[in-house]
Design a protein with these regions (language model features):
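N-terminal metal-binding scaffold of metallo-dependent hydrolase/deaminase domains
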Residues: 1-39
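Divalent metal-coordination and catalytic microenvironments
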Residues: 8, 23, 28, 49, ...
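Active-site metal-binding motif and surrounding structural segment of the metallo-beta-lactamase
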Residues: 36-53
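Histidine/acidic residue-rich metal-binding segments in metalloenzymes
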Residues: 135-303
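C-terminal cap of metal-dependent C-N hydrolases
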Residues: 318-321, 375-427
Length: 429
C-alpha cells in the first residue's frame, strides 16, 4: 500500500526544496512530491509541525560485530541508529577478526541484511590486522562491498606504508579515512595535555599528536592523488591545516563529532567520568568553538558520532584502564538541533548537507533526494520535542554517553529505509 506523508516541512538543498509539501511513498521509492496530494487507497500520515529530510548517514560508527558483541552488535547498533534518525551507517573495521578481507565484509553485509534496522556500509582496513605492516586485500574488499579504507583506532603510523596504501588503493576510487594519532607523541595520554590533565594527575595527550599526522596525511594525499578524509578532527590548528589543504587543491575532507563540539576538557573533574574519555580527547574551549565554526562555515564536511560502545564494567574501571569512546547514535541529531539549529547558528539545510548529503558523497554512495524516483530513505524529526538523555534507557547495548542527564530539544520521530518504516512515532518498528 502506498503511504502519503502530509504537511511535512521538507528540506533538501540538493533539489532546492524548503517548505511544506506532501510526499508519496510507493514501494521502496518516492512516487511524488507536491502540494495537496490526494491518492486513492493510500495510507495517510499527517506530519504537521515536523521536518522531513533525506535519510541521515553516520559515516563513523563502531558496531563491534564480529568479535565484540558483548559491547554492541549489528542489531543493537543499527537499532540505536534508527532511534537517532539514521537510515545508514558506515561501520569501522576494528573488529575481531579485523575487517581486512572480503569474507568479513560479506559477513557484515549479510548480518546487516538479516537483522539490521538501517543500511550498513562496511569500511575495510588499510593494513592487515590494523598492524600497519602490510596492505590489506583492498580489491577483495571492494568487490564485496567495502566503501572506504581506514585503520581507525590507531591510524597508519608509517608514512611509507600510508603512501603505498594510497598509491595502490586509489585505483578503486574509494576514500582513505585517517585516524590521525602519532603514537610516539601521544604515548599513554589519557586526556588533553594542559591545565586539566595536570590538575587531575592524568597523562596528557598533546594536540600536536593529532595535528602532525593531519599535515602528514594531507601531504601524502597530495603526493599520491588519493582521496583523503580526516576523521574526528578535534583541534583548531588541525582544522586550519585542513582548510589550507583544501585551498591548495588537495582532495581532503574532514568530519567532527558532537562531543568535540559540545564538550571540552573542562567537563572533566575529580569524578573521573570515564564516559568522557574519548580518542582523540576532549580539547579546550577554543578548540571546540573552532570546530563549531568550521561546521557552520563549511570547512567541516560531515558530522559523525564515532559511536564507540563499551560494557559498563569496562567503563567502571580506573580512568587509566577504561577504554576510550562514548556512544552517540541516539543523541547526535538532537545535539545538533539543540545547540546549533534551534539557536539560529545553523540552518536545517546546512545540517542536511553535513549529516546526509556530504557523507554519501564522500563514501561514493548514491544520493537520496526528496523527489520522484529517488529511494525512500527518509528521516522525520520534531525540532521542538524535549527529552532527557538516558532517562528512558538506550537502544544501544551500551550506556557510556557523555551527555547522560542532559535535556535536549529535537528528536527523530520517524525513519524510512527503502520505504520500510524502521522508526514510528519514536518507537523502533
Amino acid at each position: 500500500m502506498a503511504l502519503l506523508l502530509k504537511n511535512a516541512h521538507v528540506v533538501d538543498p540538493s533539489v532546492e526544496l524548503d517548505g511544506v509539501v506532501d510526499v508519496l511513498i510507493d514501494g521502496d521509492k518516492i512516487a511524488e512530491v507536491g502540494e495537496n496530494l490526494a491518492v486513492e487507497g493510500a495510507e495517510v500520515r499527517d506530519l504537521s509541525g515536523k521536518y522531513l529530510v533525506p535519510g541521515l548517514v553516520d559515516m563513523h560508527v563502531h558496531l563491534r560485530e564480529p568479535g565484540y558483541e558483548v559491547k554492541e552488535d549489528i542489531e543493537s547498533g543499527t537499532r540505536a541508529a534508527a532511534k537517532g534518525g539514521f537510515t545508514g551507517v558506515c561501520s569501522m573495521p576494528n573488529t575481531d577478526p579485523v575487517t581486512d578481507n572480503g569474507t568479513v565484509v560479506e559477513f557484515v553485509k549479510s548480518r546487516a541484511a538479516e537483522v539490521g534496522h538501517c543500511r550498513v556500509y562496511p569500511s575495510g582496513a588499510m593494513t592487515r590486522g590494523l598492524k600497519g605492516e602490510a596492505m590489506s586485500e583492498m580489491g577483495d574488499m571492494v568487490a564485496h562491498g567495502a566503501v572506504a579504507f581506514t585503520d581507525d583506532g590507531r591510524g597508519v603510523q608509517g608514512a611509507g606504508m600510508l603512501r603505498r596504501c594510497m598509491d595502490y588503493g586509489k585505483m578503486f576510487g574509494k576514500v582513505f579515512m585517517s585516524h590521525c594519532q602519532d603514537e610516539d607523541l601521544v604515548g599513554h595520554g589519557q586526556i588533553n595535555e594542559g591545565k586539566v590533565s595536570t590538575r587531575l594527575a592524568l597523562e596528557g595527550w598533546p594536540a600536536a599528536g593529532e595535528e602532525l599526522q593531519i599535515a602528514r596525511d594531507i601531504e601524502i594525499a597530495k603526493l599520491t592523488g588519493a582521496k583523503l578524509h580526516i576523521q574526528h578532527i578535534s583541534t583548531a590548528h588541525g582544522l586550519e591545516i585542513v582548510r589550507a589543504g583544501k585551498a591548495a587543491g588537495v582532495q581532503v575532507t574532514c568530519e567532527a563529532t558532537p562531543h568535540h563540539m559540545f564538550l571540552t576538557e573542562n567537563d572533566l573533574d575529580e569524578t573521573y567520568n570515564t564516559s568522557l574519555k574519548v580518542n582523540p580527547p576532549l580539547r579546550t574551549d577554543e578548540d571546540a568553538e573552532a570546530i563549531r565554526q568550521g561546521v557552520i562555515d563549511g570547512t567541516v564536511d560531515a558530522i559523525v558520532t564515532d559511536h564507540a560502545p563499551h560494557t559498563p564494567w569496562e567503563k567502571a574501571r580506573e580512568f587509566e584502564l577504561a577504554p576510550f569512546g562514548m556512544i552517540g547514535l541516539e543523541t547526535s541529531l538532537s545535539l545538533v538541533l539543540t545547540e546549533l539549529v534551534n539557536t539560529g547558528k545553523m540552518s536545517v539545510s546546512r545540517m542536511v548537507e553535513l549529516m546526509a548529503i556530504k557523507p554519501r558523497e564522500i563514501l561514493g554512495l548514491d544520493q537520496v533526494q526528496v523527489k520522484a524516483g529517488s529511494v525512500a530513505d527518509l528521516t522525520v524529526f520534531d525540532a521542538s520535542a524535549t527529552w532527557t538523555v538516558g532517562e528512558d534507557g538506550y537502544e544501544s547495548r551500551a550506556e557510556n554517553s557523555g551527555f547522560a542527564g542532559r535535556t535536549l530539544t529535537g528528536r527523530a520521530t520517524d525513519v524510512f529505509v527503502g520505504g520500510k518504516q524502521t522508526l514510528a512515532d519514536g518507537c523502533i518498528c
